[in-house]
């Protein structure tokens, strides 16, 4: 995989990304606590027929992590567009966002000056307005600093159990350990501020204005963002298709249902 020179955007921040292949531009954007690393398999797979790009949001992965930023999702969408412009100019893209990345993708698609770049949208395990009873019980303690999101025990138990189905955890212990290690490398301030931004995001009333074709992907056992949220998006987004991956598939569909995920995305791309 080609690790390209880091892009510098207007504020002087350096943004990391990975890229491989030629053809239509597929841009993958990761979720909360993630990085481009979570799409390495997809970059390899889709680069056979497409130009596949995965970007580290500001504050994530190998990108700069300035403490001066609020890390609200609207800003991350604008930074994302600036990075895309530096990489591919004015070319069109298909934007594929997972979890928080899917929320950013919806903001992108409902912001006219940004949306004009889109050929299509893939919304993966995401929501226009976040709610989760498990998170609701602890969010005040997290936001006040009583609970450290990046405490190793919290990551290994609560976060991993929200991200992955138990069956997958048992089948892939080495991968789960690597996922924990990568998560613990996350900047604590960024983790907290993006957590707050996810909680504050509400674009439910805007997604009816998405005009490009949209593929909505969810799974039957996602306990981080519930399948019902995807069903709601399907109702609201005019030109959209919903696929629920099963059986016993958790939040990270690109891992737990890799082959079905690849097929669903490929089948969608050839129709737009």
Q: What is each model feature region?
A:
Residues 1-26, 48-51, 88-89, 116, ...:
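Alpha/beta-hydrolase fold catalytic core
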Residues 10, 53-100, 107, 259-263:
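Active-site loop/oxyanion-hole signature of alpha/beta-hydrolase fold enzymes
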Residues 13-65:
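Conserved HGGG/HGGXW glycine-rich cap/lid loop of the alpha/beta-hydrolase fold
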Residues 106-111, 117-150:
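Flexible "cap/lid" loop of the alpha/beta hydrolase fold
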Residues 132-134, 152-208:
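Conserved alpha/beta-hydrolase catalytic His-Asp/Glu region
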Residues 210, 216-218, 222:
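Short beta-strand/loop motif that positions the catalytic acidic residue
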Residues 223-229:
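Conserved alpha/beta-hydrolase "acid-adjacent" motif
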Residues 249-262:
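Catalytic histidine-centered segment of alpha/beta-hydrolase-like enzymes
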